[in-house]
């Protein structure tokens, strides 16, 4: 993932805990932003459940060490391109994390293990290539429901796909 070219003054938009591992509060000034740039916050490994839902975000620049994105964290935004391929510590895509967006292009990390219920529900994904996700074992119910998938590639070692 490339670095953001945008200057985002995070102290105007967020309150962090003392060691910068968690966003405590999103300030009202952030409401009109369409870019979330947390790339420089290497200590941030987790984003709380529902923390950025309904913000009309178009672009995400997350810290490379991100491990956990809580359920519904980016629900109902305007994300179109989503490249998570460099987030090697991200093992599970939780329920509803990217539901109700506009995602057309999606790249996941090679070591993703599970995609939970409705993780990418109601997007615009047409080509879904998960063949590089060699540790992917489970795709849960409705994970990609209401997309426009025309071409699908899965890894050979997948164990369970729920419809």
Give short role names for the model-derived ranges:
Residues 1-24, 31-46, 55-68, 78-91, ...:
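Structural signature of tandem-repeat unit edges
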């Amino acid at each position: 993932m490339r670095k953001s070219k945008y200057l985002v003054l995070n102290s105007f938009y967020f309150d962090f805990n003392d060691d910068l591992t968690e966003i405590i509060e999103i300030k009202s000034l952030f409401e009109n932003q369409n870019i979330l740039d947390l790339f420089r916050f290497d200590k941030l490994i987790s984003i709380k459940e529902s923390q950025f839902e309904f913000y009309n975000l178009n672009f995400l620049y997350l810290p490379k060490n991100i491990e956990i994105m809580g359920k519904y964290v980016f629900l109902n935004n305007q994300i179109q391109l989503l490249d998570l391929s460099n987030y090697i510590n991200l093992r599970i895509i939780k329920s509803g994390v990217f539901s109700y967006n506009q995602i057309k292009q999606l790249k996941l990390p090679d070591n993703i293990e599970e995609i939970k219920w409705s993780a990418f529900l109601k997007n615009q994904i047409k080509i879904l290539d998960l063949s590089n996700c060699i540790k992917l074992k489970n795709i849960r119910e409705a994970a990609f429901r209401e997309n426009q998938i025309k071409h699908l590639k899965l890894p050979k070692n997948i164990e369970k796909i729920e419809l």
